[in-house]
Amino acid sequence: MNVINFIYSIFDKKLFKCGTISSRGLFYNDLNFFHFEIYFLLALITFLIFFVILSNKKNYRSYYYLNVGGIFSNLLPFVVILLLIILNTNTNDSYYLFAGFYYNDAAVVFFKNIILIGFLIFTFAIKQYLSYFKYYDFEFILVLFISLFSSLLILNSNDLISLFFIIELQSLTFYILVASKQTSSFSTESGLKYFILGCFSSGIILFGISLIYGFTGLLSYTDLTLFLSEVYVTNFILDSSFFSFSGFLIGFLLLTVGFLFKLGSAPFHMWMPDVYEGSPLLITAYLSTLPKISLIFVIFKLYYYVFFEVFLFSQGLFTLTALFSILLGSIAAIYQVKLKRMLTYSMITNTGYLLLGLSFGDISGIYITIFYLISYIFIMIGLFFCFLSLRDRSSGLLVKRINLFSNLLEVNPSLSFSIFILLFSIAGIPPLLGFYSKFFLFLFSLKYKMYWMTILFVIFSVVSVFYYIRLVKLMYFNRTTGWIFLYDIPFLNSLIISFITIINCLFFFNPNLLFKLIYNFSFYLYI
């Protein structure tokens, strides 16, 4: 017996649950399943070594030429593009690894593609942010890269414990990013608030997982699915022989509350306004878009697959939090005078629409939620790119108050038009992209006979249009005596803003392309 076979014989063969793994040995073909993760980690380690050895030496002659912002912002797009290429080499593989801890299929690859494409767009905003503020510390970039890795790894989780650990890794990076603006005490305060309340929500999730494990003895998604299908009988009546099922339901509801807290839905939104206002605008843009993709995927996996037999208990909670989020977000945003607080309440409103789609409980819910999620992220990235391009003339800082948008039409008509289109799109004005997402959401609500809820959602959707129109009114009809914005927008940022604006305007010519793509991947999550 050679050395490789001897080492392989030591391992329990249950470690590899998938039958597609080669029997020749641990070191022959098994690493083929981890090309994406290996390349990601190698890139992370390479950047870390380079920054620690060279970039952090301030007495080194070329430190000011080889700054972190310049080097990383130029290399990062190529790294992400290579990640996309490696990710899509084996898109049809479906397999379990490490006793079911790790899972991959076409739906996971689809969501990873969305996150990576979104992050690729963000790399150009990162370049502008670092170069303008002369931010040379490598920790910011490193933590941002780790947060991306954790967001991608969440999608492969197939066990409640591994899911919790990865969510905690992601949360730790978020705490650091929120408090990354060292010159601002407000940023430090926001990071501390986020840390305390984030730990509280993590404790709720962990307590729910412990109750689920205590009353079932299971943590694997696959095992829990089989177990619940056995104790559940027809007509939505629980098997009375499972005497401790009530304790399981408490854990299930605690897990649901923890995820709603992470999503920032009302009434679990208390942390969002202060945290998002205190964090740098780039981090606010990042936290409000890409991490939501991984959380929504986890909710799909848990509530449409693992806990589908008891989905009825969370369906009402999803509907109520959706209504409360839309109500609170629509009304509270009207009274905001600060840009980031207004956007935060807009995010809470859109989270309510996402939860409404999740409450449907079938493939239609998956389809409309994914479509709304992609539309929302696409529009919000465009809006944040516009806002990151605006700086106050007197202070040179990014715009904080909405009254500073006065007279923007005279300063930059093209940017004013882009903001106008994107605001109307997220408000749901036809025939823009955002209109289709809300239209199908309300259409499916009527299909499931949620008549009163649909009426309320439409009313508050109209109310939310007010604060978007108010911003447009400031740009187009308010006049000021001075020029507020006199800073050039980088070419790549202008290109991205123009592209997103054009797609929003031209989407209605051929919407079936995106519809069919999302509908096909919805089956992977539902079947």
Swiss-Prot record:
The chain crosses the membrane at residues 33-53, 66-86, 106-126, 135-155, 160-180, 195-215, 241-261, 281-303, 317-337, 347-367, 368-388, 415-435, 452-472, 489-509. Pfam families: Proton_antipo_M. Keywords: Electron transport, Membrane, Mitochondrion, Mitochondrion inner membrane, NAD, Respiratory chain, Translocase, Transmembrane, Transmembrane helix, Transport, Ubiquinone. It is found in: Mitochondrion inner membrane. Core subunit of the mitochondrial membrane respiratory chain NADH dehydrogenase (Complex I) that is believed to belong to the minimal assembly required for catalysis. Complex I functions in the transfer of electrons from NADH to the respiratory chain. The immediate electron acceptor for the enzyme is believed to be ubiquinone. HAMAP family: NDH1_NuoN_1. This is NADH-ubiquinone oxidoreductase chain 2. It comes from Acanthamoeba castellanii (Amoeba). The gene is ND2.
